[in-house]
A protein has these predicted regions:
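Hydrophobic faces of well-ordered beta-strands that scaffold small-molecule active sites
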Residues: 1-2, 19-21, 50-57, 157-159
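Loop-centered beta-sheet repeat module
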Residues: 4-40
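Glycine-rich, proline-tolerant flexible connector loops at the mouths of alpha/beta enzymes
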Residues: 23-26, 158-171
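C-terminal helical cap(s) of enzyme catalytic domains, especially alpha/beta-barrels
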Residues: 29-40, 166-186
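Bilobed periplasmic-binding protein-like "clamshell/Venus-flytrap" ligand-binding domains
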Residues: 82, 154-160
Length: 187
């Protein structure tokens, strides 16, 4: 079950076999997993029985500014869900500022560009959010971030390849990133 808000996260912990978080921010993963785990415990379940999947854009390369621009669409997509959370819980409610602060500059969102690199409706998304929500940088940067996520309890990582380096990124995952992660700590 995927979710961002406290109610959806608690429901996930109570009944779901798995939790999908559509962003790769370690802080927000920890925050989300607290709700999932607390609800699982309250329901008499082992919180570790709820498998965790992080799904986010991955872009391997050395030009971070270009990667930010290519993956900024994702912050806009997440921003749509965050806007709903702010409407429900308030700007300074249960949802951390690390998730809500950036949408203050959000204006109208045109779904005609949804999920596409270069989406003009996502200009409000700062580089910092793109970097936190996605997995960007060199092969070594990807390995480091994925290791952090794994240490926090992520069982599976799903990459989105909606940018101009699909083949290169996929090749890097197949040839370098996945083998390095498997060598460090086989599952």
């Amino acid at each position: 079950m995927a979710g961002y808000g406290p109610k959806a996260l608690a429901l996930t912990g109570r009944v779901a076999d798995g939790f999908i978080l559509q962003l790769a921010d370690p802080y927000l993963l920890e925050w989300s997993m607290r709700y999932v785990h607390d609800a699982a415990i309250a329901a008499g379940r082992d919180p570790k029985s709820v498998k965790v999947c992080v799904a986010a854009p991955a872009y391997v390369g050395s030009d971070l500014a270009h990667q930010h621009n290519q993956c900024r669409w994702f912050g806009g997509m997440v921003g749509n869900h965050v806007a709903d959370l702010v409407a429900r819980y308030g700007e300074r409610g249960e949802i951390p500022g690390a998730l809500t602060d950036y949408i203050r500059a959000r204006q109208d969102y045109d779904y005609g560009h949804h999920g596409k690199a270069g989406n003009p409706s996502t200009d409000f998304v700062p580089d910092d959010n793109v970097e936190r929500f996605c997995v960007l940088g060199t092969v070594e940067d990807h390995i480091a971030k994925l290791e952090v996520l794994k240490e926090l309890g992520v069982d599976q990582f799903n990459i989105y390849l909606m940018h101009d380096a699909k083949e290169e990124t996929l090749d890097a995952y197949g040839k370098e990133i996945i083998p390095a992660l498997e060598a460090q700590s086989p599952v």
